[in-house]
Regions:
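Gly/Ala-rich phosphate-binding loop of Rossmann-like dinucleotide-binding domains
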Residues: 33, 139, 245
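Conserved N-terminal subdomain of the carbohydrate kinase-like
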Residues: 10, 34-114, 280-285
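Conserved phosphate-binding/catalytic region of the ribokinase-like
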Residues: 155, 183-285
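Short, small-residue-enriched loops and turns at beta-alpha junctions
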Residues: 93-96, 122-126, 153-155, 174, ...
Length: 285
């Protein structure tokens, strides 16, 4: 939702509205689809908003495997853009113990070589250590697991050696309990590798991103008008994974990750392959 002016306590009218199906996991699935890879969105839906989410996810050519809750309704989150972007996120339904058990049943279908992306915040009723519990449950099955969550959650999964984590500078500070300055990002990304992460992709907004594993890789961000920040980080995750699945080296994977994230930021919605390709060619020429 975009506004020309905003006055607190008064009637305000928007000049542009757009309704998108969202959630970090769904954003990653849509981005993967745009890059030619099919994935299965997992998670919970509830109420009439849950029905609409399923409908819209299916409209992207995806086949969701959601668990339908019998109470509450899936969240409606508002992104309001005036001088700055303001977010209002609803609470959403509570996930009960039996609902969590249903998700573990679905995880049993994963097999060697699969990739599982654990993305976003915990629903009400879900333990803070849930992602770590999932990784422990799947340990030894040769499944690559990606975790994109707040810093405190990322810290819990490191002992299980996630294939990829994607913190930003603020989340690095959260993980280590101290302010991480821009010039310290590389140092602390390397610390995460030593703590167990296989790949650490740090998004730095308009300054690009860096990738840490056994080496360090850097990529500057292309210039452009930011129209939408929603899904940019999720697009980065998708592009990195597709590049690695295609057998490309780490520097190219980082560059394509930044290109996809930037292309999404420069458009309304998750960027399409064509827009990403154009931007990537401009970045590397």
């Amino acid at each position: 939702m975009q506004l020309e002016t905003f006055e607190e306590g008064k009637l305000n009218r928007s000049i542009f509205e757009q309704i998108d199906v969202g959630g970090k996991g769904i954003n990653v699935s849509v981005a993967l689809k745009h890059l030619g890879r099919i994935s299965t969105p997992l998670g919970y839906v509830a109420g009439f908003t849950g029905d609409e989410i399923e409908k819209r996810v299916s409209s992207h050519g995806l086949i969701p495997d959601f668990i339908k809750l019998d109470h509450g309704q899936s969240r409606i989150n508002i992104k309001m853009k005036h001088l700055e972007e303001t977010e209002i996120n609803a609470s959403g339904p509570t996930v009960e113990k039996e609902d969590i058990e249903k998700l573990y049943v679905k995880l049993e279908h994963l097999s060697e070589g699969d990739i599982l992306i654990l993305s976003g915040s915990m629903a009400s009723g879900v333990d803070h250590n849930f992602y770590a519990d999932v990784m422990k449950y799947l340990e030894g099955r040769k499944i690559r697991i990606v975790v994109d969550a707040v810093g405190s959650v990322l810290k819990t999964v490191l002992p299980y050696h996630p294939y990829l984590i994607k913190p930003n500078q603020y989340e690095l500070s959260e993980i280590f309990g101290q302010e991480v300055l821009e010039e310290q990002v590389e140092e602390y990304a390397c610390k995460l590798v030593s703590m167990g992460a296989q790949n650490v992709l740090v998004s730095l907004g308009t300054k690009g991103a860096l990738l840490a594993n056994q080496k360090i890789f850097h990529c500057n961000a292309p210039s452009g008008e930011v129209l939408n920040s929603v899904g940019a980080g999720d697009s980065m995750v998708a592009a990195f994974l597709v590049s690695k699945l295609n057998g490309e080296d780490d520097q190219i994977a980082l560059e394509k990750s930044v290109a996809m994230g930037s292309a999404t930021a420069f458009s309304y919605g998750i960027a399409e392959q064509e827009a990403v390709d154009i931007l990537y060619k401009e970045m590397v020429k």
